[in-house]
Amino acid sequence: MSKKNIIFIVNLGEKSRVGRNNPYSYSINSWKNWAEPKGYEVFVLTDRVYEEEYMNANWHKTYALTLLENNDIDYNQVLIVDADTIVHPDCPDFFEESDGKFCAIMNNGCYEWVNRSIKVYGDKLFNDVELKNWQYFNSGFIIVNKKHLEFFEKVHKFYDESGDIFRSIQQEFKVGNDQTPLNYLTKLYDVDVKLLPNCYNLQEMHRKNLLHFPNHSWFSDELHFLDSGWVYHFNGIPNHPERNVGYWMERTYKHLYGDLND
């Protein structure tokens, strides 16, 4: 029997952001709908490896391969995908485009934030590593395989040695959690990164005039992003009282798949 490809999703509640994961069931079910006809499996992490005070939910994605190995789950390739994404049912099989490499999608959102994050982490932890914003990927969609297990072991060792600095940077500067360090660490450890098309991680959609907000948007109230990609990442959305992340994830899921219990 051939090894299966796996979709790995972190779904952890956080005391610092209560209710953040409430709409994640829409993401998880969309991925199950996409994966099951292909014979792929979806694994959802709901138990912490470390307490929140030591490691937040974002960093737990780096344990995907370790957890699969420790539980004797064989696999071919693994997509580590954020739980604030929804996949279109007609999405092509991106695993076939990986060439066996570490794959991600270039971050295509707020360049000021990316530049600031690169600078802060560079100054504090990665002085000798050069990272440009046009090389910078979003960590919400990453394809890996067994040969990347050693890389993630190095990531964990680096976190164990520098976790206090990571946590203080996030607390003081608000420049992200795992994403910028992972970009730097792929450079530091010479990981061959292949950038896939942004259709597989359509990010910060409100900046692209793809989300309609009443009394603000000039364009029609439709799901315009459905024509702009295959995987919709609901990040960087303003906390609108009526059209927050949960609203957009629920609306998108029901449009594509119907109610959750269907």
Enumerate the predicted regions with their spans.
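A recurrent flexible, glycine/aromatic-enriched loop bordering the glycosyltransferase active site
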Residues: 129-144
